[in-house]
Amino acid sequence: SYDTGIPICRLLGGNPPDKIVYEWIQLKGMGPMSSSSGLTIGPMEALSLVPPEILRYVIARSKINRHIEFDTGSALFQTADEYERLVANPIRDEEEMTKRQLVAAETQRGAIRLSQVNPESDPSDSVGGVSFRHLSMLAQIKSSDGDVWSSLNRSGHIEGDPSDSLRGRLARMRSWIGGAHFPEDAKLEIRSEIGDDAR
């Protein structure tokens, strides 16, 4: 803990870091993450499910004195939608904004900036031209990555080969869909036969 580290830092001839107040990251509906209680999702597991920019956005958009509720289920779609909306429509016209709106706009810009893995990159590159929701649908109805890329080319979402960012997003999406955290109400089932109820 921080308090235990203070004397150790001084013993080793260093100064302890400044104390920063922060709250817990909680798994939605499960309470604070705790290795002793088994309520955890490790960073590598989280990164195998969620694009790093969206995972960073979950943290960057939160106030440091409030706990972060990390929902690996259906709310992840809403978080991704929010991130994609802010990236696609950056705030430009600030002349007629109130002071409160200006603060909110600056906070949103800061959250997007801190969400980027490479600070020099264009945030729109992280989306790859395809929304999180649309990619989840394609990942479920197309069995191969090549079929997904063909579909995206036909629909005009991409031209030619997909970006590395989009390839990574699809791999993570397939991992999320195949894992325990994907929401049941977002799962698609393709039937091979027409049932009697559909006739």
Show where each model-derived region lies.
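Catalytic adenosine-cofactor/nucleotide-binding cores of aminoacyl-tRNA synthetases and other
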Residues: Y2, Y22-G195
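Short acidic, glycine-rich loop/turn motifs
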Residues: L11-L12, L27
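A generic secondary-structure boundary signal that marks alpha-helix termini
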Residues: G13-G14, H67
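A broad structural signal for alpha-helix termini and local helix breaks/kinks
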Residues: L12-G13, V50
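Beta-sheet entry/capping signal
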Residues: N15-K19
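Glycine-rich, aromatic-lined ligand/substrate-binding cores of catalytic
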Residues: S1-L11
